[in-house]
Amino acid sequence: MKTFMASPATIDRKWYVVDAEGKTLGRLASEVAKVLRGKNKAIFTPHIDTGDYVIVVNADKVKVTGKKLDQKIYYHHSDYIGGMKETTLREMMNKHPERVIEYAVKGMLPKGPLGRQMYTKLFVYAGPDHKHAAQKPETLEF
């Protein structure tokens, strides 16, 4: 018996919608990353993108534990000398709540071209509405 290896032509992708309201950030992100990678499928192949599309709604209502709202800091650089910028989780949730989930999930995906391809199948929205009704997404519960 040979080991099954999926090929891009044999992959059947589904669309899932996840409601982030009341869910803990890290636990939600790890489950979403598993679906994006395809680890929940029997045909998972490490070097092929076998994952499904995931839509996350209500990103502004995700919860975090402890003092992370004030102590978790996101860093970025302006490419100028002394241009290190920092933003707390509270500021990020007020300005761009969808980026919080995007950064958390992106950090849990493989680094490299395959991980970047998987990341393109993630869609995050701050409110309860999304523009992917034509894909008929199924609700995914964790």
Swiss-Prot record:
Taxonomy, superkingdom: Bacteria
Pfam families for the chain: Ribosomal_L13
Keyword Isomerase found: no
Keywords of the record: Ribonucleoprotein, Ribosomal protein
Listed CDD domains: Ribosomal_L13
Cellular compartments per GO CC: cytosolic large ribosomal subunit
Biological process according to GO: negative regulation of translation; translation
Functional description taken from the UniProt entry: This protein is one of the early assembly proteins of the 50S ribosomal subunit, although it is not seen to bind rRNA by itself. It is important during the early stages of 50S assembly.
NCBIfam families, per the entry: rplM_bact (TIGR01066)
Name this protein carries in UniProt: Large ribosomal subunit protein uL13
Organism: Agathobacter rectalis (strain ATCC 33656 / DSM 3377 / JCM 17463 / KCTC 5835 / VPI 0990) (Eubacterium rectale)
